[in-house]
UniProtKB/Swiss-Prot annotation:
Keywords: Keratin, Repeat. In the hair cortex, hair keratin intermediate filaments are embedded in an interfilamentous matrix, consisting of hair keratin-associated proteins (KRTAP), which are essential for the formation of a rigid and resistant hair shaft through their extensive disulfide bond cross-linking with abundant cysteine residues of hair keratins. The matrix proteins include the high-sulfur and high-glycine-tyrosine keratins. The keyword Repeat applies. Pfam families: KRTAP (PF11759). GO terms for cellular component: cytosol; intermediate filament. This is Keratin-associated protein 22-1. The keyword Endoplasmic reticulum does not apply. PANTHER family: KERATIN-ASSOCIATED PROTEIN 20-2 (PTHR39653), KERATIN-ASSOCIATED PROTEIN 22-1 (PTHR39653:SF2). Interacts with hair keratins.
Length: 48
């Protein structure tokens, strides 16, 4: 989970911000992140 969180964190910062990495890391639903700005980013990041 740590790898996914970090990987998506980099993408999230560039696209949406903290909300991206936080939502993806905590919930772990990938495309269903709390941050709507990184919707496509989260999907391609594969942070399930």
């Amino acid at each position: 989970m740590s790898f996914d969180n970090n990987y998506h964190g980099g993408q999230g910062y560039a696209k949406g911000g903290l909300g991206c990495s936080y939502g993806c890391g905590l919930s772990g639903y990938g495309y269903a992140c709390y941050c709507p700005w990184c919707y496509e980013r989260s999907w391609f990041s594969g942070c399930f």
